[in-house]
Design a protein with these regions (language model features):
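Charged catalytic and DNA/RNA-contacting regions of genome-maintenance
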Residues: 191
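Walker A/P-loop
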Residues: 1-11
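Short, conserved "post-DEAD/DEAH" coupling segment immediately C-terminal to helicase motif II
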Residues: 198-206
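A basic/glycine-biased coupling hinge at the interface between accessory DNA-binding modules
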Residues: 13-187, 198
Length: 206
């Protein structure tokens, strides 16, 4: 809540004020845009022009989008990729189901997307998914996930889940890049750390 955000803001201000780090050496992550905006405003109030350069303050998704634009080619995207919303995701899944003769009355697109999202949050690309044998639908959904990911790449697009997933995969594969970022960020501060899911905490640990 905002009490936590306040504590975090004060910490950021102190780090910069005491010259323990430059603003761009602080990675500050929030869950909501509202909290990110609030933090930015508070730090600016406390520090004035010294707060300039706090360029790594934002939500998981906004920070990962920023990182991904820098390294998009590593996952076969261009840096001007688009981020698709839920309506576009549903449309895409409906089209795939149609071409694969899957009855969306039996298997709702929203449910398909929920499973895909679950896999992404666990850090799995389609080739890495291990199907839960007890789930009769996962067998059907995995091939859809494969096509869905390929279509996103073809469209030079990402969904929200991809933003973090792609960045984690890029950093896992590239030791040099990982070292550049871990050397750059002297402080990593997270609002509500206990709420992070697997892929989010994996990203923070990299």
């Amino acid at each position: 809540g905002s009490g936590k955000t306040k504590v975090l803001t004060t910490r950021i201000a102190n780090i910069i004020y005491q010259k323990k780090a430059y603003p761009n050496q602080i990675l500050a992550v929030t869950f909501t845009n509202k909290a990110a905006k609030e933090m930015q405003l508070r730090v600016s109030k406390l520090l004035g022009s010294d707060a300039v350069g706090l360029s790594w303050l934002g939500t998981f998704h906004s920070l990962c989008a920023k990182l991904l634009r820098k390294h998009a080619t590593a996952v076969n995207l261009n840096s001007n990729f688009t981020i698709i919303d839920v309506d576009d995701q549903i449309r895409l899944v409906k089209n795939i189901c149609k071409s694969e003769n899957i009855d969306i009355k039996q298997l709702a697109p929203r449910y398909i997307l929920a499973i895909i999202d679950k896999w992404k949050n666990k850090g799995f690309y389609p080739s890495e998914v291990i199907i839960n044998q007890k789930d009769i639908y996962e067998k059907t959904i995995l091939p859809i996930y494969k096509i869905y990911q390929q279509k996103l790449i073809d469209l030079n697009s990402c969904d929200f889940g991809d933003l973090i997933l792609h960045v984690v995969k890029i950093l896992e594969k590239n030791k040099d890049l990982r070292e550049i970022y871990s050397k750059n960020f002297k402080y990593i501060l997270v609002d509500e750390y206990q709420d992070t899911n697997f892929i989010q905490s994996r990203w923070l640990k990299l």
